[in-house]
Amino acid sequence: MQVIRLPRVAVGLLAPLVVAGCASSGGSSASGTSSSSAASSSSSAGASSSSPAGCTAKEATQPSAAATKPTLDVDGDGKPDTVWIATQPDADGGVPFGITTAAGGTFGTTIRSASPVARSVLVADVTGKGELIALASDNRQVLLYGISSCSFVPELNAQGQQYAFDLGFTGFGTGVGCVDADGDGTTDLVGLKYEPETNGVGTISRTIVELDGPQARNGATDTVTVTRASEADEAQSVSCGDVTLADDGVSSGP
């Protein structure tokens, strides 16, 4: 998605990355930043600056009927770990999700939303150098988490709310992706917004989301012209580099 490496890269929309719940709180919304706060989460493990390779602490319990899938090595022991999501809501209506490491540890959090559709989660490495994130979707917006020291860390926007990407529900964005949007040689997390045109293929706005610990802020925004048919679809989906929510994530339902 450097120029528009949308295939698997431009999966999100520009607006949602900016802030989760920004719209409802009246916060600023950069080109394509979403502000819906329909979904929220509660973390079951605290964040710390560093942790030894191979997480073994059991900070959460993986439900017996959870949907699972192999994912990245999140604890640095060189072995792939497993992302999971409950297929049934908890007593409060939330949907727990988490990661169980090859070393036997488990950590998780819960996504809460009024959306009637299934929840889904994708784990990704933004830069390919260990900048791990989790993208939790309720098909209306995508909540952004950092993954650090064997815990999910909700990334907060300037208003102190969890950062979220819009998926066309509020009109701020349409997807999430990871591409080198500023041409500096490093992949960026971006919010995407596809704008169809009556007499053309349309354009895609890309807003870089800058991560600094538990803080997420909107960075530069640019607009590119769609050059191939699949780019419009990619700009209306969730992906990061070579992984997509549809193919590599876990879902709480069909």
What are these regions (language model features)?
Residues 126-127, 133-158:
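Long, charged/polar, surface-exposed segments that mediate recognition or autoinhibition
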Residues 21-24, 77-80, 84, 145:
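Primarily hydrophobic membrane-targeting regions of prokaryotic envelope proteins
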Residues 76-86, 125-137, 181-192:
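Acidic/hydrophobic-patterned starts of short beta strands in beta-sheet-rich repeat architectures
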Residues 95-101, 142-145, 203-208:
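Hydrophobic beta-strand positions in blades of beta-propellers and related beta-sheet-rich domains
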Residues 66-74, 116-132, 172-182:
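Beta-propeller blade termini
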